[in-house]
Amino acid sequence: MPEPIQSGDDALRVSVLSEALPYIQRFSGRRIVIKYGGAAMAHAELREAVFRDLALLACVGVQPVVVHGGGPEINQWLKRLEIPAEFRDGLRVTDADTMDVVEMVLVGRVNKQIVNGLNQLGTRAVGLSGSDGSLVEARPWGDGSHGLVGDVARVNPDVLEPLLERGYVPVISSVAATPGDGRAHNINADTVAGELAAALEAEKLILLTDTPGILRDRDNPNSLIRKLRLSEARQLIDDGVVAGGMTPKTECCIRALAQGVSAAHIVDGRVPHALLLEVFTDAGIGTMVVGRG
């Protein structure tokens, strides 16, 4: 007679797999754009957890698209090369020397580290920058006083379609060129992820951050708002509940939803396997913003 299944950890694993099943069925064949950065990129154990999450998503038929930043490593290289780092209005002021470092780090180092990490797990990852195939066309941000800081002028999703159809996972750095002069610009990775999600008609946009999500009280991590309608997210910005660095992330979610993305999530990337917990469990771990409902 077979022994009964162990209680405790074994039963919990079975329960988690069972809970994930309807979500796996629902999102198989769907596209999810993930912005990867912050603490989830800086610590080896969290990096490995993110890579495994992405590999599992791909294994069960989800089509993940990864957009990444790399601020901490950029700062390390600027310091090593004795180039001063300057931030204004929450954006990195980017002169020509700084842009050279940004492009080297994001396109040449961080992007390949992510691609190699995914490929080692059997995932077929392909590294791109926004400039490749004019995937993302840039325009100068604001009045140009921040130097080579850019915004998204246009997205050409046709570059990604053949890759996604063949089961590849695109890994995209947030560097793109202006079409007129071909100059590389540094674009906020959240912005690139949001615009790509809209252009790809993605099911979800997920921003991995260094906070639990949108908080009712920014000083109280237990005040996490689990779910918001689009109109409620706008109201929180107007009321000043969403402020500081959370404002552009929330605005990014709002823009993506307004362009047809089904749901946008702000998730704590410091939590191991945050992606799977958000996508494949009933409760999730972050804030989900939806267009309606």
Curated annotation (Swiss-Prot):
Subcellular location: Cytoplasm
Gene3D superfamilies in UniProt: Acetylglutamate kinase-like (3.40.1160.10)
InterPro entries per UniProt: AceGlu_kinase-like_sf, AcgluKinase_fam, ArgB, Asp/Glu/Uridylate_kinase, Glu/AcGlu_kinase, NAGK-C
UniProt main location, coarse: cytoplasm
A GO term from the CC aspect: cytoplasm
PANTHER family assigned to the protein according to its UniProt record, in alphabetical order: N-ACETYLGLUTAMATE SYNTHASE, N-ACETYLGLUTAMATE SYNTHASE, MITOCHONDRIAL
High-level lineage: Bacteria, Bacillati, Cyanobacteriota, Cyanophyceae, Synechococcales
Site (Transition state stabilizer): 35, 249
GO terms of molecular function: acetylglutamate kinase activity; ATP binding
One Pfam family it belongs to: AA_kinase
Keywords, comma-separated and alphabetical: Amino-acid biosynthesis, Arginine biosynthesis, ATP-binding, Cytoplasm, Kinase, Nucleotide-binding, Transferase
This protein's record includes keyword Zinc: no
Physiological role: Catalyzes the ATP-dependent phosphorylation of N-acetyl-L-glutamate.
Record EC number: 2.7.2.8
Keyword Amino-acid biosynthesis applies: yes
Pathway connected to this protein: Amino-acid biosynthesis; L-arginine biosynthesis; N(2)-acetyl-L-ornithine from L-glutamate: step 2/4
UniProt name for this protein: Acetylglutamate kinase
Family: Belongs to the acetylglutamate kinase family. ArgB subfamily.
Binding site for substrate: 70-71, 92, 186
Top-tier EC class: transferase
